[in-house]
Amino acid sequence: MMTKIKLLMLIIFYLIISASAHAAGGIALGATRIIYPADAKQTAVWIRNSHTNERFLVNSWIENSSGVKEKSFIITPPLFVSEPKSENTLRIIYTGPPLAADRESLFWMNVKTIPSVDKNALNGRNVLQLAILSRMKLFLRPIQLQELPAEAPDTLKFSRSGNYINVHNPSPFYVTLVNLQVGSQKLGNAMAAPRVNSQIPLPSGVQGKLKFQTVNDYGSVTPVREVNLN
């Protein structure tokens, strides 16, 4: 029982210290999503450590849309130590075969940060370390697309089928839907894949117009759109 109490106190203490540290600074990524033009040799995203005295071990990798680690990408450096008040650049290089030329391909970039521990200050005590995993969408975009990504949300077609909202996305771009709401019922965020039909679960009995927003290439939320569900 005492061991559990000590562990709980240790967790609470760590969270308080961690919250204080993050108030003074933190680890930040230079984007919330990455657009990788298919003809580019590489793309990059910066990572900044604004802490004044804390170092972090940073580990990065890319997964496919199924959550499996993707070997067709190289990230340099894949593992490094982020020093206090420093900025580093993660370079992303696609080395795989050509992908679909008529639509975007989706991947996920993962960045895990682990705070360093001063072993000399521990004096044999146990310390709970909390790693933070940040995930962002990576879109590999074909260069020959004629459509504009900013126009993709306006091409979406919505209809209702029982307890589902059918979403048809005729564009070649992934469209991230946020702040979805039917009537007064709020729904979870969703993503409409390019050139396919998808469905969004809808609680039974919900009536009203569909309101939603989207996220553009820069990670900004667009104005509210409103459509009727036929």
Curated annotation (Swiss-Prot):
It comes from the Bacteria. NCBIfam families: PRK15195.1. The lineage of its organism: Bacteria, Pseudomonadati, Pseudomonadota, Gammaproteobacteria, Enterobacterales. GO terms for cellular component: outer membrane-bounded periplasmic space. PANTHER family: CHAPERONE PROTEIN FIMC-RELATED, PILUS ASSEMBLY CHAPERONE. Part of the sfmACDHF fimbrial operon. Could contribute to adhesion to various surfaces in specific environmental niches. Increases adhesion to eukaryotic T24 bladder epithelial cells in the absence of fim genes. The keyword Signal applies. Induction: Expression is negatively regulated by H-NS and subjected to cAMP receptor protein (CRP)-mediated catabolite repression. It is found in: Periplasm. Residues 1-23 form the signal peptide. Its main location: periplasm. The keyword Transferase does not apply. This is Probable fimbrial chaperone SfmC. Pfam families: PapD_C, PapD_N. Disruption phenotype: Deletion of the operon under classical laboratory conditions does not result in any major effect on E.coli capacity to form biofilms compared with the wild-type strain. Belongs to the periplasmic pilus chaperone family. GO terms for biological process: cell wall organization; chaperone-mediated protein folding. The operon is cryptic under classical laboratory conditions, but is functional when constitutively expressed.
